[in-house]
Amino acid sequence: MERITLDFAIKAALDAAALMPEGYIYTNPDGEVAVELSLIGGGISCSYFDDKDGSPSCLVGHILHAAGITAQHIPAGHSGSGSHTLIEELEECEGLMVDTDASSFMSTIQNLQDSGVPWDDAIREGVSAYL
């Protein structure tokens, strides 16, 4: 399992965003599209991995997958939970190592993504906050 440093997390997030059309706004496996938080007063709940095929779904899921985490590693009940909570459990139960700044970056981009910010913009904001 790969240690998740800030550089690793940024690269994995950029790689995930490169797979999507420019301006991609996250759609969870249930087909719900994140919309701007200011428009409806809330965001959506992301899924780290697709329950149907196990593929990474949200930005944090892509980062975890790049580090060697699969859907089978995600404890029951963590779909839609905050990334800090999940990371703490994966560190304890699976031996995942995540640097503090990487964990904060992942939380930031997850919150932005879930409120409808396009992936490239969420990553850019996360990078500017932590570099």
Can you say where each PLM-predicted feature lies in the sequence?
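Catalytic phosphate/metal-binding cores of nucleic-acid and nucleotide-processing enzymes, i.e., regions
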Residues: 2-5, 23-32, 37, 41-49, ...
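Surface/interface-facing alpha-helical segments and adjacent flexible terminal/loop regions used
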Residues: 7, 11-18
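Active-site nucleophilic cysteine motif
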Residues: 51-66
